[in-house]
Amino acid sequence: MHPPAIALPDLLLALDGTPVTQPSQWAARRSEVHQLAVPLAYGPWPAVSNRTTCEMLHAATVRRFDDARLWTCRVLGDGIHRFLLRVFAPAGTASHAAVLNGDGCWHYATDTVIADMLRRGYAFAQFNRVEIAPDTPGARLPVGALAAWAWGYHRAVDALGQIDLVDPARIAVVGHSRGGKAALLAGATDERIALTSANNSGAGGAGCFRVSGPGAETLADVTQAFPHWFGPGLAAYAGREHALPFDQHFLKALVAPRALLTTEALDDLWANPVGSWRTHDAAHAVYDLLGAGDRIAITYRPGGHDHAPADWSTLLDYCDVVFRGRSAQAFLHRNRLTP
């Protein structure tokens, strides 16, 4: 199925009508893109912490993971918000590229997934985003939950920079479903994140508000069911998505030229795999402008809504491209399914 031919706002046309044709113009246009998309979609941003502390609570060797190192830390950001961060790293003293996941409230990162990550030479860090903001409709939050969860990713990146197990220049963030929305927002708003990956993230994530495939969650659906995720103004565009000054390709473009991977499932219609293709295609123009066309990828697998082992494996394959210089073309050639 091919995405409907509905026009999306032009990423390469500045607000004053000037075409953006040179890489040197992108910084100014990027600022516009951020202001058009992030405050409206996700609401006010949490206060930026001047100092994040990472207090180690426990260090251990994990036999079932071939003597991998495990650190359990308490992360304290802005002096108020605190959450636990667990970091696994392969045995030895080296620092490693790391995959950071905020879905500790779920159990998609099984022992098998973690063992494979460690075997392939990557560290794995995880926190529970609902320690930062509850995922409860009707909750009175000072900011939208997605913004709070993205803030949690940022504070976890702060903490990983204080841990010898991790190379802070090689951090990938990943999340699934609503966690994928948070991971994409985190990567779009923190240039320290080297690779951003959103899995089955749908409306408000890698999907598209204007372009919806059959059975896809709409802007009305998501803002009615989960108003606490978003900024207070977004719901007003339900049924009039054409009037939005942005769509989710804006969020993807904010990641450029850093690496971006979208992973989708062909049968996960609610997550709008058709719309995800459209926002990927539109954001690609910015990556091409910046000479980073091989740093944006989208893959589809058979099956439904899940952070499946195949999705984790695909992420590690792309980590090999970004962090170890493996062939991007070979990666894309192996992942040629389309919606």
Language-model features, listed with the residues they occupy:
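Hydrolase active-site cap/lid region
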Residues: 184-232
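Cap/lid segment of the alpha/beta-hydrolase catalytic domain
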Residues: 94-162, 202-205, 209-211
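Glycine-rich nucleophile elbow surrounding the catalytic serine of serine-hydrolase chemistry
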Residues: 175-185
